[in-house]
Design a protein with these regions (language model features):
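Transmembrane alpha-helical segments of polytopic membrane transport and secretion proteins
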Residues: 1-45, 133-135, 231, 313-322
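A structural signal for multi-pass alpha-helical bundles of membrane permease subunits
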Residues: 40-322
Length: 322
């Protein structure tokens, strides 16, 4: 005969006390929160985390530290005092007219490069997405400059935009004097057009991939309603690739912020009179050539903060529009 005690239901432990099973489940939940749903993923991501820490986090932290000290490169084994100077390096950066000119140059670059990159890559991707003769050839030809070494393409552009080059000969008396890359007004716009042309292939590829995800039924419905090509493009294509447009814009802004190779090769590093220099080029010249890494680090930190602010504002605007 079953006793009354054996039939009595088991009561939960008093408040604040957990049974062995509950404690184990709680511990597992804490592990999942700390390491993710699958802790084994931490093992696979460890090499990438190490890569980020060594090549990005540590150099960035060191640059921030250097920017607050009077720092010089020395021979191995030589120890020199590196006093803390507070914001003195940042004050020197903000007071330097060459730095202000470099940021103005990048602003000019972005005003030209970003709209051109977005508009041309989207229009060309839309055209290449249609059924046209030699479509594969055109897709490949637009991608060739992107994978070609900058030294080779720069040589072509130096020839084209020289005083006796093809562009100047075609324009005749309308060509600027002095020629494009030694002209204070035209040096940076010419560099912006070159960077746009060279990077167009990868952005066309991004838009082509995005266009595959736009439902064809939307185009068919718009065509049935009598919408023109422009109306279909504005009402169907542009909203359908909005996320890629954000990505292309961000990549173009980052490209402008990191501009170095193009002015270094096309104008010899900022000529004429600093009108084609960039902040990264300024970092190289002051930090490496002139041995002022403290000044260069402060400039680099300001540049990183500026790019992060631009990216943050753009993300905020995108969320509000969505």
């Amino acid at each position: 005969m079953t006793s009354i005690a054996s039939r009595r239901p088991k009561l939960p432990p008093p408040s604040g006390e957990l049974g062995p099973g509950a404690r184990q489940a709680r511990a597992q939940r804490l592990v999942r929160v700390a390491l993710g749903r699958h802790p084994i993923g931490m093992i696979f991501s460890a090499p990438y985390a190490f890569f980020i820490a060594v090549l990005f986090a540590y150099p960035l932290g060191l640059a921030v530290w250097i920017s607050f000290h009077r720092y010089f490169f020395t021979a191995p084994g030589v120890s020199v005092p590196r006093p803390y100077v507070g914001l003195a390096n940042y004050d020197a950066v903000l007071d330097d007219p060459a730095v202000r000119q470099a940021f103005l140059n990048i602003l000019i670059f972005l005003v030209i490069n970003v709209p051109l990159t977005v508009m041309l890559s989207l229009l060309l991707a839309t055209a290449l997405n249609a059924v046209i003769p030699f479509r594969a050839f055109f897709r490949t030809s637009f991608f060739v400059p992107y994978v070609t070494a900058s030294v080779a393409t720069v040589g072509v552009w130096l020839f084209m935009f020289s005083s006796g080059g093809i562009i100047s000969n075609l324009l005749g008396p309308l060509a600027p004097h002095p020629s494009w890359l030694v002209n204070e007004q035209w040096a940076m716009p010419t560099i912006a057009i070159y960077v746009t042309w060279k990077g167009l292939g990868i952005f066309i590829l991004l838009y082509l991939a995005a266009l595959q995800g736009v439902p064809k039924e939307l185009y068919e419905a718009a065509e049935v309603d009598g919408a023109s090509w422009w109306h279909r493009f504005r009402s169907v294509t542009v909203p359908g690739v909005r996320q890629v447009t954000t990505l292309v814009t961000l990549l173009a802004v980052i490209t402008g912020a990191n501009l170095f190779t193009e002015p270094y090769l096309l104008t010899g590093g900022g000529a004429p009179n600093g009108k084609s220099t960039s902040p990264v080029l300024q970092i190289y010249e002051t930090g490496i050539e002139q041995n002022h890494p403290d000044f260069a680090s402060a400039l680099g930190v300001i540049l990183v903060v500026g790019v992060l602010l631009i990216v943050g504002i753009q993300q905020l605007v995108q969320r509000r529009q969505a």
